[in-house]
């Protein structure tokens, strides 16, 4: 099944967004040649970015998630619009660490201490950026903390990436469950109890459950109503035309017959330009 996103309500006071993202994360892994640890970290961030960007209202709006830590992975940058397409990269994609005490990939140690930034470009004069300190570096907790303290949105945020021994992605997904203002205390208690009884997100996906089924179990006995379902994936907006302006600084350094190679940070796509092409562009546009 292709990757997809669902959004909906459960009763009057629970709003949810869920994403199944295995193919998206696998595409990122292959493009960036990620280690197992880096796959888990970037995969969680890509999934979180899809979820956060799904609340954008207009086609041209853009959300960028940046995570900068002092751990060996360095940092992560991801961006997405409300169309479900995401792109992203990680500073040090080859880093690997020993498993943590729970025998899992140690994303928290890989990211370390630092800050999380969410920037929303809504076509206004200036983009809006909110920031919080990292809580754990595990990404889900950090995004949940951001939503609660920067946007006053009480929530449960769950992200998971299961990586095979050969490095390929077995499962990936995430869900955001929000408690709306005015919710009775018993709703919160019910969610807490249900969450405490659940297996991990990736375990349930590996057992064949769909993300909407997992969400239904979390919000039970409140019945879910899905009002959005759409495909998601890894897609970069880079092009030769967009990269060429960044090369005009080489104007005086390259000869006409020289070939310059440019690589997109977000997707590792390679583009080649001749010195003559760079010079002609500069002369026409400066």
UniProtKB/Swiss-Prot annotation:
The record, for Pfam families, names: HSP33
Tell me the disulfide pairings in this chain: 236-238, 264-267
Chaperone found in the keyword field: yes
Instruction: Please name the GO terms that the record assigns under molecular function.
Output: protein folding chaperone; unfolded protein binding
Name the GO cellular-component terms: cytoplasm
HAMAP family for this protein: HslO (MF_00117)
Question: Entry's PANTHER family?
Answer: 33 KDA CHAPERONIN
Q: What is this protein called?
A: 33 kDa chaperonin
Q: Which gene encodes it?
A: hslO
